[in-house]
């Protein structure tokens, strides 16, 4: 039986390029170790379409993060070329990439998520949500240009920094434990509790290697079931497919708040999704294989 040809898409031109390169290398190494006919392709290539047509893969493993991998453009391209790919469809990627659109859908379905809105008139909008608040780009990931703002005096600088990355949203700050749940289609994995290096799980906390991760999270059986059910419902409501990750805050009252859904999570051996799977005895190679097997067009 002829082996499937796999192209791992990584890199790209988003601010998360370096993270994507690490994810792509980890996935490619895993596939090669498992005997797959796999090659890597940097999505920043101006000849991306030509190279994809030349390689003519059976499947593409999307290891892109940020705009290039999560805004639906790459998924749309692969779907038009008839190439099966990991992750969500173009429509779902468009929704999950925009945190405000995602949040509005979740709120419509009465899912627990902090109140938020676009930050257009900074003073008026901030007055409607009591401090502290989170200020961040509506699109993007890795907590780039995300700020905890405690006063009007801090708001201007946060807005200026976040607005470099597109539209800005302001969100009620929720204090509690940071919990995340990885999903691959119908498989909902163990929750992970993150103790960030800094006050919250910002870019430095994510990639400094100094944050502490608890996998499994240590939630009681009832709360573990609750957070998994919430994660799967959010995943389904936003039309996610394949591998995705749902991030929560778990407050001191015992309530979960959905913060965002990531349609193309990190895929190094130290990333959150592999930790979530590892907590259930699934090693990195097996996790990569399970994601690849769910590839669709």
UniProtKB/Swiss-Prot annotation:
Binding residue positions for ATP: 129-180
GO molecular function, one term: metal ion binding
Localization annotation: Cytoplasm
Catalytic activity of the protein: 2 D-alanine + ATP = D-alanyl-D-alanine + ADP + phosphate + H(+)
Residues binding Mg(2+) 2, per UniProt: 260, 262
Family membership: Belongs to the D-alanine--D-alanine ligase family.
Function: Cell wall formation.
Protein name: D-alanine--D-alanine ligase
Species this chain originates from: Francisella philomiragia subsp. philomiragia (strain ATCC 25017 / CCUG 19701 / FSC 153 / O#319-036)
Lineage of the organism: Bacteria, Pseudomonadati, Pseudomonadota, Gammaproteobacteria, Thiotrichales
Gene that this polypeptide is encoded by: ddl
């Amino acid at each position: 039986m002829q082996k499937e040809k796999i192209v791992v898409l990584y890199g790209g031109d988003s601010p998360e390029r370096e993270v994507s390169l690490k994810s792509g290398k980890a996935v490619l190494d895993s596939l090669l170790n498992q005997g797959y006919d796999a090659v890597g392709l940097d999505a920043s290539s101006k000849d991306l379409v030509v190279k994809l047509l030349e390689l003519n893969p059976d499947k593409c493993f999307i290891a892109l993060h940020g705009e290039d991998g999560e805004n639906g453009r790459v998924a749309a391209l692969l779907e038009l070329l008839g190439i099966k790919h990991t992750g969500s469809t173009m429509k779902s990627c468009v929704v999950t990439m925009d945190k405000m659109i995602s949040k509005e859908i979740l709120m419509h379905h009465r899912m627990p998520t902090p109140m938020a809105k676009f930050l257009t008139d900074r003073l008026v909008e901030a007055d409607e949500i009591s401090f502290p608040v989170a200020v961040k780009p509506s699109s993007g990931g890795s907590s780039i240009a995300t700020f905890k703002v405690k006063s009007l005096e801090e708001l201007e600088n946060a807005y200026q920094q976040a607005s470099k990355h597109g539209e800005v949203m302001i969100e009620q700050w929720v204090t509690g434990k940071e919990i995340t749940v990885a999903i691959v289609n119908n498989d909902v994995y163990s929750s992970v509790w993150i103790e960030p290096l800094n006050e919250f799980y910002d870019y430095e906390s994510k990639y400094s290697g100094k944050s502490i991760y608890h996998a499994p999270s240590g939630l009681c059986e009832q709360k573990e079931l609750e957070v998994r059910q919430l994660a799967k419902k959010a995943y389904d409501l936003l039309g996610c497919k394949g591998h995705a990750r749902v991030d929560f805050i778990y407050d001191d009252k015992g309530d979960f708040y959905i913060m965002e859904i990531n349609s193309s999570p990190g895929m190094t051996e130290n990333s959150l999704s592999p930790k979530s799977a590892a907590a259930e005895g699934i090693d990195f190679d097996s996790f990569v294989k399970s994601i690849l097997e769910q590839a669709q067009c």
